[in-house]
Swiss-Prot record:
It catalyses: N(4)-{beta-D-GlcNAc-(1->2)-[beta-D-GlcNAc-(1->4)]-alpha-D-Man-(1->3)-[beta-D-GlcNAc-(1->2)-alpha-D-Man-(1->6)]-beta-D-Man-(1->4)-beta-D-GlcNAc-(1->4)-beta-D-GlcNAc}-L-asparaginyl-[protein] + UDP-N-acetyl-alpha-D-glucosamine = N(4)-{beta-D-GlcNAc-(1->2)-[beta-D-GlcNAc-(1->4)]-alpha-D-Man-(1->3)-[beta-D-GlcNAc-(1->2)-[beta-D-GlcNAc-(1->6)]-alpha-D-Man-(1->6)]-beta-D-Man-(1->4)-beta-D-GlcNAc-(1->4)-beta-D-GlcNAc}-L-asparaginyl-[protein] + UDP + H(+). Substrate binds at residues 377-378, 553. N-glycosylated. Glycans are attached at residues 109, 114, 117, 333, 432, 446. The chain crosses the membrane at residues 14-30. This is Alpha-1,6-mannosylglycoprotein 6-beta-N-acetylglucosaminyltransferase A. It comes from the Eukaryota. UDP-N-acetyl-alpha-D-glucosamine binds at residue 525. Its main location: Golgi. Pathway: Protein modification; protein glycosylation. InterPro entries: GT18_cat (IPR026116), MGAT5_Glycosyltransferase (IPR052105), MGT5A-like_N (IPR027833).
Length: 740
């Protein structure tokens, strides 16, 4: 037995009445026009009644379909059926009225000539834009007008791919792909996010639900301690977080007062530490308490703390079993399409080791999570090594590259690779409140402290250290039984606790670099305690071309000193970059340091608050899943032309600016360059890291043919590179002045 809703019954009745009255109105119009042309009021009143019934009919149907989307691809029994129904109805009425008009016109005017004149003055309803009923019913008439694709550089290429490959996997048809351009566009905008959403399409209900979940800052660590207690591998990080807890809580409260942290979406975040898994073969967690490398653990603990305090939902994995458990919903999915439903994760923080584990675990589903990845990568990955086929063509054999990610998805320890993103870390202050009161009373001694806790770092450095010893005492913190490279006059304290090291630094005037290790946190700790840093200069610069340490790393970056960040972004009076083999230069620097009085200095970006600000900006603004979201804002763009032999990184740095790779796409067309007075008489597309570029003699422009190859690194031998630079906040290099 069939049941009908009152609304459907009402709309059917109204439809029947509308057709009936339409016919009656037409007949009466004919009658009144011939017999009673002096009474237009009656016809007008009847017309108003018909219009009123029509409005009620449309309103009834609209009420039935108020929650559905319009358009030929919206599905059956939706608002688009309303158009089909009205199309049939109106077509029927218009055909009848057209015939009536023709007959009435002939009867009234009597001649074809007059008829022509009359229709010129008052156009027939039928002569207006015709409605093709068959097209509407078949879903053809409503054209799929595509929105502008600005900011979605991959959209056009993906549409071309879909045209050829949409039958390669039945999942595309399950999502409504039917071979038409509009269905391709809907899939690529709503399922895979490569294209802008069509304006008439409803929003994804899962996205709407996600936006209802807002992040609220946290001011205690109870939940985080509970999560980390389950893993012995996290012991060192947990102790660091506990030591710094008060500073972190003060920082999040301070940041919340300075900028609006409300109405932020709470993200589901996976943190997978591949370097701590048993399968990695590393023993980092085991050696953390016995002089092993700590840089990665420092960065991971500070990242986890920041994500937690900013109010996001985090899940931490340090084993393959945990990773599989978290991602079990998509593990084994062989489909080329993403899984339907609520997202498991929205952001994934991972390292290079974990990246390989993650890809193997997910299988084909990997492609749907690539855009969510943020890869902790201390030394950086340049576009030349990230692009698999390009790296292959150049003969690069690094085991760490060829991931084909957006280069900005790699997060570095220092802001040394502008093609990547600067994540950083926090320089720890090991002192409690009573210590701080006492430490300010400590008088600086005429002494230096050498940066090098391993005996081998001191090899062949005696002549350099002798110069320093002429002017002051030399102290060290070398551990281990071997001290054969350490001069006899050095006072070695062995391994010190963080607190004791802080007191020693407060007594010291000079922190002495030996040239290795590269880019460590210790010089920043020394500067924060009021020491000057003697930073060894490298001439020629060190890179994978001349230094074994860098061989195999996915970068051709050249280090001009032991600590390029300190050299470029801090400088004198805190940092003195000198040639160790130039006695006069070393002596002059030591004398100047002894004669100066400097205050402790800590760049904001290496404080708890600075890191919270930076990570929050990245989470809120960086988006590699929805086309190229315009951040940093274009207002920060400053275009520079590099001379032949000069990279974009260099030319921007010379102007106290930063190369900003996200702006390259706005300099990759002839019309774009006209704004900056660069006129191309000819142009071509080329897939290389050295373009876009300009050859002044012939005014020939070369544009980028592969978006993953945009690069701030690399110098063209004959062309001028066209470089996108931006400003930055002093002490917060990752952010431009308009970025917050």
């Amino acid at each position: 037995m069939a049941f009908f809703s009152p609304w459907k019954l009402s709309s059917q009745k109204l439809g029947f009445f509308l057709v009936t009255f339409g016919f009656i109105w037409g007949m009466m119009l004919l009658h009144f026009t011939i017999q009673q042309r002096t009474q237009p009021e009656s016809s007008s009143m009847l017309r108003e009644q018909i219009l009123d019934l029509s409005k009620r009919y449309i309103k009834a149907l609209a009420e039935e379909n108020r929650d559905v989307v319009d358009g030929p691809y919206a599905g059956v029994m939706t608002a688009y059926d309303l158009k089909k129904t009205l199309a049939v109805l109106l077509d029927n009425i218009l055909q009848r009225i057209g015939k009536l008009e023709s007959k009435v016109d002939n009867l009234v005017n009597g001649t074809g000539a007059n008829s022509t004149n009359s229709t010129t003055a008052v156009p027939s309803l039928v002569s207006l834009e015709k409605i093709n009923v068959a097209d509407i019913i078949n879903g053809v008439q409503e054209k799929c007008v595509l929105p502008p694709m600005d900011g979605y550089p991959h959209c056009e290429g993906k549409i071309k791919w879909m045209k050829d490959m949409w039958r390669s996997d039945p999942c595309y048809a399950d999502y409504g792909v039917d071979g038409t351009s509009c269905s391709f566009f809907i899939y690529l905008s709503e399922v895979e996010n490569w294209c802008p959403r069509l304006p008439w399409r409803a929003k994804n209900p899962y996205e709407e639900a996600d936006h209802n979940s807002l992040a609220e800052i946290r001011t205690d660590f109870n939940i985080l301690y509970g999560m980390m207690k389950k893993h012995e591998e996290f012991r060192w990080m947990r102790l660091r977080i506990r030591r710094m807890a008060d500073a972190w809580i003060q920082a999040i409260k301070s940041l919340a007062e300075k900028q609006n942290l409300e109405k932020r979406k709470r993200k589901k975040i996976l943190v997978h530490l591949g370097l701590l898994t048993k399968e990695s073969g590393f023993k980092i967690a085991e050696t953390a308490f016995s002089g092993g490398p700590l840089g990665e653990l420092v960065q991971w603990s500070d990242l986890i703390t920041s994500l937690y305090l900013l109010g996001h939902d985090i899940r931490i994995s340090a084993s393959l079993a945990e990773l599989k458990e978290i991602m079990k919903k998509v593990v084994g999915n062989r489909s080329g399409c993403p899984t339907v439903g609520d997202r498991i994760v929205e952001l994934i923080y991972i390292d290079i080791v974990g990246l390989a584990q993650f890809k193997k675990t997910l299988g084909p589903s990997w492609v749907h999570y690539q855009c969510m990845l943020r890869v902790l990568d201390s030394f950086g990955t340049e576009p030349e090594f990230n692009h698999a086929s390009y790296a292959q063509s150049k003969g690069h054999k690094t085991p760490w590259g060829k991931w084909n990610l957006n280069p900005q998805q790699f997060y570095t320890m220092f802001p040394h690779t502008p093609d990547n993103s600067f994540l950083g870390f926090v320089v720890e202050q090991h002192l409690n409140s009573s210590d701080i009161h006492h430490i300010n009373e400590i008088k600086r001694q005429n002494q230096s402290l050498v940066y090098g806790k391993v005996d081998s770092f001191w090899k062949n450095k005696k002549i350099y250290l002798d110069i320093i010893h002429t002017y002051m005492e030399v102290h060290a913190t070398v551990y281990g039984s071997s001290t054969k490279n350490i001069p006899s006059y050095v006072k070695n304290h062995g391994i010190l606790s963080g607190r004791d090291l802080q007191f020693l630094l407060r007594e010291t005037k000079l922190f002495v670099g030996l040239g290795f290790p590269y880019e460590g946190p210790a010089p920043l700790e020394a500067i924060a305690n009021g020491c000057a840093f003697l930073n060894p200069k490298f001439n020629p610069p060190k890179s994978s071309k001349n230094t074994d340490f860098f061989i195999g790393k996915p970068t051709l970056r050249e280090l001009t000193s032991q600590h390029p960040y300190a050299e470029v972004f801090i400088g004198r009076p805190h940092v003195w970059t000198v040639d160790l083999n130039n006695r006069e230069e070393v002596e002059d620097a030591v004398k100047a340091i002894l004669n100066q009085k400097i205050e402790p200095y800590m760049p904001y970006e290496f404080t708890c608050e600075g890191m919270l600000q930076r990570i929050n900006a990245f989470i809120e603004k960086q988006d590699f899943c929805h086309g190229q979201v315009m951040w940093p804002p274009l207002s920060a763009l400053q275009v520079k032309l590099a001379e032949p032999g000069q990279s974009c990184k260099q030319v921007c740095q010379e102007s106290q600016l930063i190369c900003e790779p996200s702006f390259f796409q706005h300099l990759n067309k002839e019309k774009d360059l006209l704004k900056y007075k660069v006129t191309c008489q000819s142009s071509e597309l080329y897939k290389d890291i050295l373009v876009p570029s300009f050859y002044p003699k012939s005014k020939h422009c070369v544009f980028q043919g592969d978006l993953l190859l945009f690069s701030c690194a690399g110098a063209h031998p004959t062309h001028q590179r066209i470089c996108p630079c931006r400003d930055f906040i002093k002490g917060q290099v990752a952010l431009c002045k308009d970025c917050l």
